[in-house]
Amino acid sequence: AEKLEESSAEAKALSYVHDATTSGHDSYQEGQKCINCLLYTDPSQEEWGGCAVFPGKLVNANGWCTAYVARG
């Protein structure tokens, strides 16, 4: 799988960023990032990993998008 580009249409549609702290989106809350999101497929992947929202792409573990769902 290849890394998701922030500039891609799919990433922009969900305001995806590689570094959550740079988000600036109204829904972003401090501490939220891909690695602690329910949609991140393998939390043991600490740098880049799969995401249910972006099939076939890798997202940054420290990234964020508007589909964020806190992992139980």
Curated annotation (Swiss-Prot):
Binding positions for [4Fe-4S] cluster per the UniProt entry: 34, 37, 51, 65
One Pfam assignment: HIPIP
InterPro entries named among the record's database cross-references: High_potential_FeS_prot, HIPIP_sf
MF GO annotations: 4 iron, 4 sulfur cluster binding; electron transfer activity; metal ion binding
The entry's keywords: 4Fe-4S, Electron transport, Iron, Iron-sulfur, Metal-binding, Transport
Annotated positions of the N-carbamoylalanine modification: 1
Similarity annotation: Belongs to the high-potential iron-sulfur protein (HiPIP) family.
SUBUNIT field: Homodimer.
Name of the protein this chain belongs to: High-potential iron-sulfur protein isozyme 1
Protein's organism: Ectothiorhodospira mobilis
